[in-house]
Amino acid sequence: TSSTTKMFVIGHNHFNKSLTLDIENRLMLYLSSVGNVVRVQNRKENPQNEYYTSNELDSIFSKIWRSLRKRNQSLFPIESIVRNSAIFKASPFHKLTEEQIEAKNTIINKIIASISKGQEGTLILVKGEAGAGKTVLMSSLVDDLLNSEDISFIKDNNYINLVVNHNNQLSVYKEIERKLNWNSGSTLEVAMKPTQFLNALKKNAIKAGVVIVDEGHLLLTAKNQSYLGGNH
C-alpha cells in the first residue's frame, strides 16, 4: 500500500448480504466505465436474485455514488455520464436477464461438449434483434471464459479471443481488456480485428481455440489486402 492510498468504507442500515453484494457489483460496473480508473482488482461477480430490499438498490446506490462524488469528482463522475459511456454499455458487469443467462449457459455447454468430443471447427451462432443485449452477453461470456474458475479447464486447453471488426467497438473492448487485465493465454491480445487476428495466428504458428466473433455477418467475404491468406 502507498502512503497516498485511501479507503472508502460504505455502510447503510438497510444493508443485508444480498444488497451489499449487489452494491459491490454495481460499483464494479460503474468504476470499470470511468476513464480515470486504470484497473479493477476485485472482479468476482455475485449477481443476486430478488430479495427483501432489492427494490431499494437503485436509490441506495445513487445516494452512495453522490456521497462518493463529494469526496472525489474525478473518480466518481455524475451517474448519467457513466451510464452513457460506450464502455458502460458493453461492460461484462451488467446483471444479465434470465434469457441472457440461459443463452450464455447454452453456449458454454456447447463449447464444453465440443472440447470433450475433440471436435474442431464447431460453429455456434447467436441471433438477436438490435438492442436484444447481444453485446453485454458476449462481453460477459468472454469474461467468464477468461476468468471463471468453474470452467477454467476451457482456457487451460484453449486460447480465448474476441474478434471485432468495427473500430469504435474494438476500442471499447480494448479498454475493457486493459482494465480487467484480460489474458488470452497466448502471446496474442484478446480483442483483435479479423485480419490482425488471422495474420497473427499464421505469423506465430498458433492454432485458434475459442473465438468469439462480434457482428460476424459483417466480416468481409472478398479478399482483404491486409490479410496474408485467402478469403475469409
Where are each of the predicted segments found?
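Beta-sheet entry/capping signal
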Residues: K6, L123, Y159-L162, K207-V211
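AAA+/P-loop NTPase substrate/partner-engagement loops
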Residues: D144, S148-W182, P194-A200, N204
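Conserved RecA-like ASCE ATPase "motif II neighborhood" in helicase/translocase motors
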Residues: L180-H232
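Hydrophobic positions on the alpha1 helix immediately C-terminal to the Walker A/P-loop
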Residues: L137, L141
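Conserved helicase motor core of SF1/SF2 NTP-dependent helicases
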Residues: T97, K104, I108-I115, K127-A132, ...
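Switch/connector loops and helix/strand junctions flanking conserved nucleotide-binding motifs
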Residues: F15-L21, L170-V172, L219-T221
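Boundary/linker segments flanking structured domains
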Residues: S3-S114
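Pre-Walker A (Motif I) flank of P-loop NTPase domains
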Residues: G118-L125
